[in-house]
Amino acid sequence: KFDSKIMINSKSFKQNEADHLVLINEFRALEQKISDNSARAKPKFDKRGQLLPSARLKALLDPDSYFIPLSSLAGYKIGDDDGDKNIMGGNSISGIGYVSGVRCMINVSDSGIKGGSMTQMGVEKALRGADIIKENKLPLISLVESAGANLLRQSEIFIRGGKSFANLAKLSAMGIPTVAVVHGSSTAG
């Protein structure tokens, strides 16, 4: 049993709740901008007979199961991410969901945004995901279509980006399954 002294009908609780709901709605609106940014590429994807990254994720997940997005605002207003028209979320969709009844970490290159090119904060997002995988012994599924490193920012990601490849070897050594499905180009990785 969890004991709490919170008085949910108190004026201060109601005010805190209202203030937090405003912030949550602002957060969700930013997440929606990322999704909308990716969806602008839909005509290109349709022409190539491809699904958008968000649709790939939906097709992968068990029907009626949940997906917990992680680090969805990675890189907010850093580098090329202006927080508005070019909001990127680290150029990937990452989170925990169920595939064939198994709880997994899923990472989807968001190739609808700048070809899924990797950014500094996208690398940090992937490294944080690897920590969660190791701690919770979650299988990793990656849906990959990426232009590789953003060449204009390559010096910012080269060293830390290499750690993501080392993490794959560590996961393998730990007996944690890793699966990558490549949907198009996968430059340098």
PLM features per residue range, with description:
Residues 1-179, 183-189:
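Terminal-region recognition feature
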